[in-house]
Amino acid sequence: MDAVKMLHALIPPHALDAVRRAFERHAVLGMTIVEVRGPGTDGHRSVHRGAVVTDGLVPCLRIESIVHDDVVDRVVDEVTAAVRAEGRLWVVPLDLVTRVRTGERGADAV
């Protein structure tokens, strides 16, 4: 069974197209994208009882995708180069991936 890893990326929304192109170049076709708020230098500003309040969080996207081990370093390098902004990437090894519909396991399930 070929090794696969879970790639997590926290990126600004404007970087999504560049990240998708980097994924496609390495045949990383499936991903989950969620709108979240994360730490940033600007933060979210609101007015509460006449005072401006900044919570230190900015809108961003969290992307999760399963990536084959042999391309994960190249994908991380390309995403890092493409985003060129505030963001985070982290990679987690996966012990087992199963495609529920077919029962395929490991890299075949990706």
Question: Where on the chain are the PLM-derived regions?
Answer:
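Positively charged, small/polar-rich N-terminal and surface patches that mediate targeting and assembly
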Residues: 1-110
